[in-house]
UniProtKB/Swiss-Prot annotation:
<feature type="transmembrane region" description="Helical; Name=5">
    <location>
        <begin position="187"/>
        <end position="207"/>
    </location>
</feature>
<feature type="topological domain" description="Extracellular">
    <location>
        <begin position="1"/>
        <end position="18"/>
    </location>
</feature>
<feature type="transmembrane region" description="Helical; Name=6">
    <location>
        <begin position="236"/>
        <end position="256"/>
    </location>
</feature>
<keyword id="KW-1015">Disulfide bond</keyword>
<keyword id="KW-1133">Transmembrane helix</keyword>
<dbReference type="GO" id="GO:0005886">
    <property type="term" value="C:plasma membrane"/>
</dbReference>
<feature type="topological domain" description="Extracellular">
    <location>
        <begin position="70"/>
        <end position="88"/>
    </location>
</feature>
<feature type="topological domain" description="Cytoplasmic">
    <location>
        <begin position="114"/>
        <end position="133"/>
    </location>
</feature>
<dbReference type="Pfam" id="PF03402">
    <property type="entry name" value="V1R"/>
</dbReference>
<feature type="disulfide bond">
    <location>
        <begin position="84"/>
        <end position="171"/>
    </location>
</feature>
<feature type="topological domain" description="Cytoplasmic">
    <location>
        <begin position="208"/>
        <end position="235"/>
    </location>
</feature>
<feature type="topological domain" description="Cytoplasmic">
    <location>
        <begin position="40"/>
        <end position="48"/>
    </location>
</feature>
<comment type="function">
    <text>Putative pheromone receptor implicated in the regulation of social as well as reproductive behavior.</text>
</comment>
<keyword id="KW-1003">Cell membrane</keyword>
<dbReference type="GO" id="GO:0019236">
    <property type="term" value="P:response to pheromone"/>
</dbReference>
<comment type="similarity">
    <text>Belongs to the G-protein coupled receptor 1 family.</text>
</comment>
<dbReference type="InterPro" id="IPR004072">
    <property type="entry name" value="Vmron_rcpt_1"/>
</dbReference>
């Protein structure tokens, strides 16, 4: 390995693990915040459970990604077949949970916001139950499409083999036949189009409701809207930003995946795809925390308690 390649690998390693570090810290804060709010007995919002769940999923997924990617920089492979299959399949499994939970969150928020005259209003009472069943079903379906990893993932024995698609120094994918590749490509395309399309529709629906709400508020007040947003509007904007960010990341990830298939697992494309694929898991909790006004109230309350304790002890 020459000096330029060494510098490139070092810079890439620092950049990727910085992203992973930010993601782990942000998801841990978001998960602890929702846990603490639940322990304190605050009345939870209907979207708190899906957001807390996706924070936990992203936390585990990023830890797995860090462990798998560390093997990418090892001087020699050290995993066996079982380890490769286990870690790569678990990573894909938690990615599927992330996508399905994000889709469930967008649909759930759209159902909550729909007016009573809408056909979606009849799902309001039973929406948590229905969406939980939908989440479980889609997670199983999403993961089953990636079940071929249990067969295709193997420990890399010879780095000079031209038939393998390299994932890390220790793990590779066996090449698939053209018929199997077409089958899995069709299933993957159907899966992505369905989930991303569902999220896109629910996002557009929420944006439409938000615009209508602003228009009606302006008509009632006969003036410009107050710059202070209501909690409901902040919740809508948070979900809209999450969905928009997810759709952008998913589009880039799909393009990179397709490009890797065309160019037979090019390593440079894989190096670009890794941080792109984990961008949503790493930075989405920052969007939620930035728009979470309850966090500010919680921090002020904790600060007041610390000040009181210090005054009592002194």
């Amino acid at each position: 390995m020459n000096k330029d390649n060494t510098l490139y690998c070092s810079a890439y390693r620092i950049a990727f693990f910085s992203e992973i570090g930010i993601g782990i810290s942000a998801n841990s804060c978001l998960l602890l915040f929702h846990t603490f709010m639940f322990i304190r007995g605050h009345r939870p919002r209907l979207t708190d459970l899906p957001i807390g769940l996706v924070a936990l999923i992203h936390l585990v997924m990023l830890l797995l990604a860090a462990y798998i990617t560390e093997d990418f920089f090892m001087s020699s492979g050290g995993w066996d077949d079982i380890t490769c299959k286990l870690f790569i399949f678990l990573h894909r499994f938690f990615r599927s949970l992330s996508v399905c939970d994000t889709c469930m969150l967008s649909v759930f928020q759209a159902i909550i916001l729909c007016p009573q005259s809408s056909h979606l209003a009849k799902f309001k009472l039973n929406s948590p139950h229905h969406l939980s069943c939908f989440f479980i079903f889609m997670s199983i379906f999403y993961t089953s499409i990636s079940s071929h990893i249990l067969i295709a993932a193997i420990a890399t024995q010879n780095l000079t083999s031209v038939n393998l698609i390299y994932i890390t120094k220790s793990c590779s994918f066996l090449p698939m036949s053209s018929s199997m590749q077409r089958t899995f490509s069709t299933l993957l395309a159907f899966r992505n189009v369905f989930l991303i399309g569902l999220m896109g529709l629910s996002t557009c629906y929420m944006a439409t409701l938000l615009c209508r709400h602003k228009t009606r508020s302006q008509q009632l007040q006969n003036s410009k809207l107050s710059p202070k947003a209501t909690p409901e509007q902040r919740a809508i904007w948070t979900i809209l930003m999450l969905m928009s960010f997810f759709l952008i990341i998913s589009t880039f990830d799909s393009i990179m995946t397709y490009s890797r298939t065309i160019f037979q697992g090019n390593q440079s494309l894989y190096c670009v795809q890794i941080p792109v694929a984990h961008g949503y898991a790493a930075f989405s909790p920052l969007l939620v925390l930035n728009n979470e006004k309850r966090l500010t109230s919680l921090m002020i309350s904790m600060y007041d308690r610390i000040v009181r304790l210090e005054s009592l002890c002194s």
